[in-house]
């Protein structure tokens, strides 16, 4: 430590002070940290968007060291960069997600409704019905749901051991056979017009309703593959040397 002159000012009434000097012999270096892991997730277009903005960064996007996994059942695309470099590897996952309101309807699921409960839900979501007037009529029908049940029981036994044991139940109600919705099935995709059937399950006084749409199931299969194929086409044009693997 070089000799340096210092000036010390005393408070009134003080005549002396003790000065302590601490000399550091080691440099105070910052610790060396591992790079942060890049693990991103978003909509089905996320992989293409990431590549579009980073394709010029050769250290990050070496196409021969990247690959994309395609899972059509889970409706996902997963990009992995720097595949052999655990310190600098990055993953970007894009997923085709269902439109939240479509899920709320519970179409083609095990979800069931009480008639009054379903009428309230339809009333609050009239914007998704093709015909607003028909929506109000359907709401009224559900609020005043009526059903009659015709049951037949046949039970007999013959001397030769033959036995008959049959039970049949026919439910007649004021519910319409079907109605039409206009709603997106997947996020970021256009709205689809689908025909929806109301299925009634009557057990004594317990009445549960469910919504079924074969047409929606067809659209799910078609749109899932269409959306994924559209993204793969864009990716192949942008980065043709990235390996694309179907799972």
Predicted regions and their residues:
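Alpha-helix boundary/N-cap detector
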Residues: 35-42, 109, 113-117, 133-140, ...
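Intrinsically disordered, low-complexity segments that are common in secreted/host-exposed effector
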Residues: 10, 106-112, 153, 158-175
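An N-terminally focused, membrane-permeabilizing/fusogenic/translocator signature enriched
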Residues: 1-85, 239-247
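Amphipathic, membrane-inserting segments
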Residues: 43, 57, 62, 69-71, ...
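A glycine-rich, hydrophobic loop/mini-helix early in the fold
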Residues: 85-119
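Membrane-inserting effector segments that mediate pore formation, membrane fusion
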Residues: 110-160
């Amino acid at each position: 430590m070089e000799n340096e002159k210092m000036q010390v000012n005393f408070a009134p009434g003080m005549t002396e002070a003790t000065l302590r000097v601490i000399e550091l012999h080691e440099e105070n270096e910052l610790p060396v940290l591992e790079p942060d892991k890049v693990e991103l997730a978003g909509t089905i277009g996320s992989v293409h968007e990431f590549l579009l903005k980073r394709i010029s960064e050769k250290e990050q996007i070496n196409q021969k060291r990247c690959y994309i996994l395609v899972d059509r059942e889970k409706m996902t695309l997963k990009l992995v960069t720097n595949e052999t470099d655990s310190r600098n590897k990055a993953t970007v996952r894009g997923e085709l997600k269902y439109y939240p309101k479509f899920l709320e309807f519970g179409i083609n699921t095990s979800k069931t409704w009480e008639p009054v409960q379903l009428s309230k839900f339809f009333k609050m979501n009239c914007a998704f019905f093709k015909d607003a007037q028909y929506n109000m009529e359907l709401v009224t029908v559900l609020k005043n749901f009526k059903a009659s049940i015709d049951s037949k029981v046949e039970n007999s036994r013959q001397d030769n051991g033959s036995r008959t044991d049959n039970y049949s139940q026919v439910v007649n109600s004021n519910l319409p056979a079907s109605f039409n919705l206009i709603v997106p099935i997947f996020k970021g995709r256009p709205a689809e017009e689908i025909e929806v059937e109301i299925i009634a399950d009557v057990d004594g006084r317990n009445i549960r309703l469910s919504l079924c749409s074969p047409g929606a199931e067809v659209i799910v299969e078609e749109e899932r593959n269409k959306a994924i194929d559209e993204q793969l086409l864009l990716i192949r044009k942008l980065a043709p040397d990235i390996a694309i693997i179907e799972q």
